[in-house]
């Protein structure tokens, strides 16, 4: 709906592709403010912006069709920024922004809230956002299943036991047969995907540090590695936008943790790596 006025003025598929790229690019604005919160100087912020623009996940996903996931980077980054600023209204508006994108966008908001609860001890605001996200998610799924065309839970059939065709079925599989789930997540095709997603960030999201960073990997595991739906683990499509946004934030957190390594050097290496993968 936000893009409809532009489409009315310039109807056509080309304008939709351009608008999608612009929407994704807007994510750099809250990203810069997040970088400033982590004590980055302007030169470092420029490098961080370059990483964002050339990050293959963001750039490659712009070239195929149009998808509501394009709003995830800017929405998630705004929510993270609002939490870091401890802005009540910012958190409220950003949470609404994220939840309004699609039903499963609530999962990203939930993981951000969980991370803020444990890493920044923002118990009250974090728990409220978490509960709102969970209630919204199950409410939206119920509505779609009963009054719409149903959710796309069939894309998770490989991790949902027969007769348990819902989100709870995924949780059951993880608890009952974790070895099977592990095999689904780290097969050869998924390992190639992990390299493409992580290498431009120098694998910083999984660099040893504070354990809370593991929380930010949740959507990657859930949406991109667990399902066998091939497009979920293909950066040429938009299904990695949300997960990659959290990975990028995790990389920023890791850079701040690595006090002995100059931020400029790490960001420069990330920029070069992103450009190389972008060109490959």
Model-assigned labels for residue ranges:
Residues 107, 214-262:
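Hydrophobic/aromatic-rich transmembrane helices and adjacent perimembrane loops
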Residues 108-134:
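Perimembrane helix-loop-helix junctions
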Residues 37-39, 71, 76-90, 117-120:
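Membrane-interface transmembrane helices that cradle and orient dolichyl/undecaprenyl
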Residues 181-184, 192-217, 221:
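Hydrophobic, aromatic-rich transmembrane alpha-helices
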Residues 60-69:
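Short acidic/glycine- and proline-prone juxtamembrane loop motifs at membrane-interface regions
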Residues 18-38, 78:
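Transmembrane-helix motifs of polytopic, lipid-linked glycan transferases
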Residues 43, 130-134, 258-280:
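Signature aromatic-anchored transmembrane alpha helix within multi-pass, membrane-resident enzymes
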Residues 45-54, 81, 95-99:
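Short helix- or helix-capping micro-motifs
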């Amino acid at each position: 709906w936000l893009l409809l006025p532009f489409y009315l003025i310039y109807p056509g598929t080309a304008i939709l592709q351009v608008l999608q790229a612009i929407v994704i690019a807007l994510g750099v604005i809250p990203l810069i403010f997040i970088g400033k919160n982590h004590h980055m100087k302007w030169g470092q912020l420029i490098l961080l912006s370059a990483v964002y623009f050339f990050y293959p996940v963001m750039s490659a996903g712009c070239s195929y069709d149009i998808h509501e996931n394009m709003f995830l980077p800017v929405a998630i980054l705004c929510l993270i920024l609002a939490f870091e600023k401890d802005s009540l209204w910012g958190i409220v508006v950003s949470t609404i922004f994220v939840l309004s994108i699609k039903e499963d966008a609530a999962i990203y908001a939930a993981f951000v809230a969980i991370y803020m609860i444990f890493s920044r001890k923002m118990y009250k605001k974090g728990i409220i956002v978490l509960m709102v996200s969970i209630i919204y998610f199950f409410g939206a799924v119920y509505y779609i299943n009963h009054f719409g065309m149903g959710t796309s839970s069939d894309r998770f059939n490989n991790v949902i036991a027969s007769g348990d065709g819902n989100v709870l079925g995924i949780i059951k599989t993880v608890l009952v047969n974790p070895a099977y789930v592990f095999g689904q997540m780290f097969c050869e095709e998924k390992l190639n995907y992990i390299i493409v997603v992580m290498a431009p960030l120098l694998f910083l999201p999984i660099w040893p540090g504070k354990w809370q960073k593991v929380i930010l990997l949740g959507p990657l595991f859930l949406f991109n590695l667990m399902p066998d739906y091939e497009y979920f683990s293909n950066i040429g499509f938009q299904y990695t936008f949300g997960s990659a946004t959290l990975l990028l934030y995790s990389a920023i957190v890791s850079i701040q943790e690595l006090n002995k390594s100059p931020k400029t050097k790490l960001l420069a290496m990330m920029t070069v790596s992103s450009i190389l993968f972008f060109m490959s």
